[in-house]
């Protein structure tokens, strides 16, 4: 899951799919 939940990185599933990383 995504440990860093931010506005453009939620929900966790989207975070994983987008490859989002903490700033």
Swiss-Prot record:
- Per the record, residues carrying Proline amide are 23
Summed up, the tissue specificity of this protein is:
Expressed by the venom duct. Is present in all duct parts with a highest content in part 2 (proximal of the venom bulb) and then decreases in concentration toward the end of the duct.
User: What is a GO molecular function of this protein?
Assistant: toxin activity
Please name every pair of cysteines joined by a disulfide bond in this record. 2-10, 5-15, 9-20
Quote the subcellular location field of this record.
Secreted
Q: Which UniProt keywords apply?
A: Amidation, Disulfide bond, Neurotoxin, Secreted, Toxin
GO annotation, cellular component aspect: extracellular region
Q: How does the record describe the protein's post-translational processing?
A: The C-terminal amidation is described in Ref.1 and PubMed:23031820, but not in PubMed:22709442 and PubMed:36235146. Ju et al. (2022) describe a disulfide connectivity (C55-C61; C56-C69; C66-C68) that differs for the usual one.
Notes concerning its domains: The cysteine framework is VI/VII (C-C-CC-C-C). Displays a mini-granulin fold, a structure composed of two short, stacked beta-hairpins connected by two parallel disulfide bonds. This newly described fold is derived from the same cysteine connectivity as knottins (ICK fold). The name 'mini-granulin fold' comes from the structural homology with the N-terminal region of the human granulin.
- Function summary: Causes convulsions mice.
- Any further remark recorded for this protein: Shows a very weak inhibition on Nav1.4 and Nav1.8 sodium channels.
Q: What is this protein called?
A: Textile convulsant peptide
- Organism in which the protein naturally occurs: Conus textile (Cloth-of-gold cone)
Q: What is the lineage of its organism?
A: Eukaryota, Metazoa, Spiralia, Lophotrochozoa, Mollusca
């Amino acid at each position: 899951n995504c440990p860093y939940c931010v506005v453009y990185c939620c929900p966790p599933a989207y975070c994983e799919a987008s490859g989002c990383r903490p700033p």
